[in-house]
């Protein structure tokens, strides 16, 4: 028998994912918990960020959604927005106080995620907001190394213009230049 979480609001959760703005507003007005975390630790804000639901993200923020909640793997809504390349959502999350240097359970940051996928507009926003360009994850990779691994030339150029350290070594003694 599956035990149902009494705090879970499927209507609200699905409305956030599907971008049903009127339903999201209605559910918030009816008392939906904007910071509820499911079994994986994910929130409605993470779900809306992942699905590029700009209006839903903003109404969640306006109603107290915590931008720095992390899921069971340490991922935040900011990391999701950076990975998806949604500059508007990324800026809204940063403006709401998201930690641009938060790390997931593998030590990866939103900047590293954006660099791996070549999301240059998000890379610029994160750097402008104070993201540390030379942070390294648990295997020693930096944002520059991630961009190099993925052959993201424009991202590499952008990081070099912003003084990314080309001499950092990962845990295997490899630099971004190797």
Predicted regions and their residues:
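Ankyrin repeat start-site detector
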Residues: 7, 39-40, 72-73, 105-106, ...
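Intrinsically disordered, low-complexity regulatory segments in ankyrin-centric signaling systems
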Residues: 1-30
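Ankyrin repeat A-helix N-terminal signature
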Residues: 14-19, 47-53, 80-86, 113-119, ...
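Ankyrin repeat (ANK) core detector
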Residues: 12-13, 43-46, 76-79, 109-113, ...
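A generic tandem-repeat structural signature
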Residues: 66, 71-88, 104-108, 113-117
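Ankyrin repeat structural motif
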Residues: 20-28, 53-61, 86-94, 119-127, ...
């Amino acid at each position: 028998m599956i035990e149902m979480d009494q705090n879970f609001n499927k209507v609200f959760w699905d409305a956030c994912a599907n971008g049903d703005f009127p339903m999201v507003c209605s559910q918030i007005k009816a008392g939906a918990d904007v910071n509820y975390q499911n079994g994986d630790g994910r929130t409605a804000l993470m779900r809306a960020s992942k699905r590029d639901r700009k209006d839903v993200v903003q109404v969640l923020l306006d109603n107290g959604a915590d931008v720095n909640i992390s899921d069971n793997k340490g991922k935040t809504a900011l990391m999701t927005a950076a990975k998806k390349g949604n500059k508007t959502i990324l800026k809204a999350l940063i403006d709401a106080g998201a930690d641009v240097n938060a790390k997931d359970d593998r030590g990866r940051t939103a900047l590293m995620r954006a660099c791996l996928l070549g999301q240059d507009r998000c890379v610029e926003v994160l750097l402008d907001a104070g993201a540390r360009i030379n942070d390294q994850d648990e295997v020693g990779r930096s944002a520059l190394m991630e961009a190099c691994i993925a052959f993201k030339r424009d991202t590499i150029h952008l990081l070099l213009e912003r003084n990314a350290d080309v001499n950092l070594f990962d845990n295997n003694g490899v630099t971004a230049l190797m």
